[in-house]
Structure formats: C-alpha cells, structure tokens
Amino acid sequence: MLEMLERGILMSVQTMNHPPFLTGDAFRKRTQTRCRGRANSSTALQLSSDESGNYAEPCTSLLSQPNTIGVIGGVSLLSTLIFLEKLACWGSRNGKECPPFVVSSDPALSKMLSLRGPLPSARTRFDRIKLNQDLVIENLRCKRNFLQQSGARGLAMPCHLSHAWHSEISEDSSLPFLHVGDCVAMELKNAKLKPIHAAGIVRIGLLTTDSNFVASYYQERLQSQGFEVVLLDKATEEHVLVPAMEALYRKDIEGARNLLRIAIHVLLVRAVNLVLLASDDLLGVLPHNDPLLRKCIDPMDALARSTIHWAETMVKQILACLWMH
C-alpha cells in the first residue's frame, strides 16, 4: 500500500501553462513546511469510516466558511489522500492559506464493487460494477449529504470511476459540484494547443482501465470544447494495457512500465497532443524523470486546481460584496 502511495506521489506531470507538480521529497518537504505554521488553520479533515455506508448526521456544521471544499472519497483511499496533497500544494502556493476542506471516505465502495484482492478480468470487473451501481450511487449521495451538512459549500470527487455517476450524485443538490472532465477541458482550451495532424482538430489521447464507464464522459466534455478524444483500439487494449495492469499486480514494475510506454506511444503516433492517464492504476508507474510524462496529464491535477480556484473566487466575491457595502 505504501508503495502505491509513493508511486502516486512521484507521478510527475507537466500540464499546459502550469509548472510541473512537485514530486518526492521536495513535494513532501514543501507540504510539511506549508502546514507547520498552520496548526490553527481552519482546514478540517473528516475521514468517516462505516462499513455499512451510512453516515451519522452532524449536530452542527464542522465548518462555516463559504469557501469550504467538500471532498467525496472514491474507490481508492490512496487516491483521495493524494488529491488532498494536491489541494494542499495548490492551495498554499505563494504563501496563501489553504482553503478549509472536509472529507468523507469509507471502505464500503471497494467492498460493494468487490475490487479488492486479485485483479479481475475486464468483463468480470464490468459486471461487478454494473450489478452494484445503484448501491454505489446511494453511497456517494450519502457522502454528498454528509459533506453538505458538515459545512461544505462546493464539492469535488477525486475518482474517475465515480464520475460515471456524477449527474446522479448531484441530483437534488444546489452545491457547485466540479466535474473532472470539465476541468480538464477548460485547461486544455486555455492552453491554446495547436493540432498536429491534417484534420485541424486537437486530439487528446485517453488511457483508462475502466473505458466502459470513463471514456464516454471524457469524450462528451472534451468534444464540447472542440477536442477529439482518441482511445486505444480493442486489440491494443487487450494485448498491451490489460497485460500492463496484470504485470503491475504481479509487482513486475519494469514489465508494467514497458507496456505502458507502448500504449502511450500508440496514441502519440495517432497525432494526439497529450495523453490523459485517467486511472489510479496508471499513475506513478513510469519513473518521474521519464520523458514520456511530458506528454501525459493526471486529470486530478486539473480538478485540484479548479477546486482551489473556486474556493479563492468565493472569497473574492465575498470581499467585493463587503467592500461595496
């Protein structure tokens, strides 16, 4: 588990006009330095763990600030923790105070989807998710309600798979709920990328281990901003990407790296500008100094930046209203 966390933290991405995400010891030292002087900060962390997936309603809101971020934990606890580290990094840049946040995470999702243990086949994984998706949606809606009752004023969900049900989770809620696909699309649009093939459309590659659930919403959100999303063909997915995941589960890191490099190259030769690594399993596989990572994006970086931007905008709006009155 610690090895997986380390791989996630060491993932180095260089996205558009933003500086590369800090990695390894430098990243941890910065986070520790930023947080050391903030012991009295209003940032709050609520990790609620309930095997049943039920949440006790708080008597009063934990936080009352209008820029409080609510983080809905997904299938992977490690991914949630890495996202919180991203929030801390971007939220405390230039000496700023990290916005307050409250988090809800529990082991019920992995249990519902039976994703623990040996790597299931793609078909088995798909069947398990489809069979239990109603329970998953209810679990995530309970988390949303818990966060709202705890004082969250905006929501983020650092889980690619959970975003497949973003619209269902956000029903009957008035809170702003950022979508990772929108965040990526907006950053790509602001980067003003130039097409590198004759058709004149900027192509973005997508690698995911849950293409049946994840690919459609990335295609929808990016196509709405004028991008073409390019996926692996079925043969390459079955003979390259799936074996890469199998190698990773066998702890054959070098084998997984070589296969992932092949998958990325397959997309690059199809004239994509960048490749989205839209899977927790894919992040951190390549070493942080691998030149291929300059062509890869962790979509959760875009979600973290957009979340911090929302929180900072809320503060500016309130200050503007106070100044006017």
Per-segment meaning from a language model:
Residues 1-325:
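Non-catalytic structural scaffold of enzyme domains
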